[in-house]
Amino acid sequence: MTNYRVESSSGRAARKTRLALMGPAFIAAIGYIDPGNFATNIQAGASFGYQLLWVVVWANLMAMLIQILSAKLGIATGKNLAEQIRDHYPRPVVWFYWVQAEIIAMATDLAEFIGAAIGFKLILGVSLLQGAVLTGIATFLILMLQRRGQKPLEKVIGGLLLFVAAAYIVELIFSQPNLAQLGKGMVIPSLPTSEAVFLAAGVLGATIMPHVIYLHSSLTQHLHGGSRQQRYSATKWDVAIAMTIAGFVNLAMMATAAAAFHFSGHTGVADLDEAYLTLQPLLSHAAATVFGLSLVAAGLSSTVVGTLAGQVVMQGFIRFHIPLWVRRTVTMLPSFIVILMGLDPTRILVMSQVLLSFGIALALVPLLIFTSDSKLMGDLVNSKRVKQTGWVIVVLVVALNIWLLVGTALGL
């Protein structure tokens, strides 16, 4: 009886430790449901129904492995990816890495900020500029939580992730997708046309985000409590749960677009405004409002995450620190310039995804090299199977993004 109590007590303590260590992956997972994903998934679902759902499944599995490697690097070495690159690469290479990472962080933030502004415009009936002002105020308020430490921010970001997931459960109820066709689309690969290949590349490009690769290693490098193996075990659970939620949201986005648009003949729906306006008569005003609210939640949370990622790359690569509010102010400026110039916001979203594709391999290659180094990683070094899988992902992601870039350049 005494032994049972001791085991029960130790089991509760282990669960408590694991729970305390969870949270960083929920911040990273927000990068996988930003407005760029909304635009790409809606276009894919409207154009090809359920046929590209399998791409979301595989992209999410790849993203899970990448985020586990990023988190593991921080746990094993106590340094984030940007700091490891700074320590191991020549100075000119480090400066190149910093410049491209900053450009990518700003391009990401541009898409996320404008996405949230579009959401405010749709649900409140304000102008895009007024939506941008509301987005700026809201992100400043969320970033103020950072003063209280990482945990409060994790809770708010995690709450927004769960809100978006709940919103898409509601959208699925409204749209009532064909479950048999949905299941088939998730497991049977299909690329019926060259446009489908291009959209599949876009889905993958919008899913794997370089800025959260840098960020996740930073969020785990200062984790305390439990042994190193316990921290790694908790992190695997953290990533599995958070990325499963993000994967569900992406699947639900595409499935809703398929059920609501593709099978009603609206196969040309390609932007967020059009999706909102088309949802109202097809499903209901409530469905359109839920869509708008989910876009706001995803945009706000992902633009906060983008700001944090920008801070990490600056501190990691060049050891320079600026206050978060200064960075937030500077990175908002391109969004306001785009809006004031009257540029097409959906086109800007697509262009930002193309810019992101340049940074994916630049983040993935050193991540795989460092996490495969036994001197750096010790007992957390990558296994042979993980190394092989990792390099296959790198080759696949690079190939698909080259296809995406060429296709975009040719105007496909």
From Swiss-Prot:
Coiled-coil annotated residue ranges, if any: none
Record key words, sorted: Cell inner membrane, Cell membrane, Ion transport, Membrane, Symport, Transmembrane, Transmembrane helix, Transport
Topological domain spans for side Cytoplasmic: 1-19, 72-95, 146-155, 221-238, 298-327, 371-387
Transmembrane segments: 20-39, 52-71, 96-118, 126-145, 156-175, 197-220, 239-258, 277-297, 328-344, 351-370, 388-406
GO cellular component, one term: plasma membrane
Topology in the lipid bilayer: Multi-pass membrane protein
InterPro entries the record matches: NRAMP_fam
Entry's Gene Ontology molecular function annotations: cadmium ion transmembrane transporter activity; manganese ion transmembrane transporter activity; metal ion binding; symporter activity
Location in the cell: Cell inner membrane
GO biological process: iron ion transmembrane transport
Segments on the Periplasmic side according to the record's topology features: 40-51, 119-125, 176-196, 259-276, 345-350, 407-412
Xref: NCBIfam families: nramp (TIGR01197), Nramp_1 (NF037982), PRK00701.1 (NF001923)
Annotated function: H(+)-stimulated, divalent metal cation uptake system.
Entry's family note: Belongs to the NRAMP family.
HAMAP family: NRAMP (MF_00221)
Name of the protein this chain belongs to: Divalent metal cation transporter MntH
Protein's organism: Escherichia coli O9:H4 (strain HS)
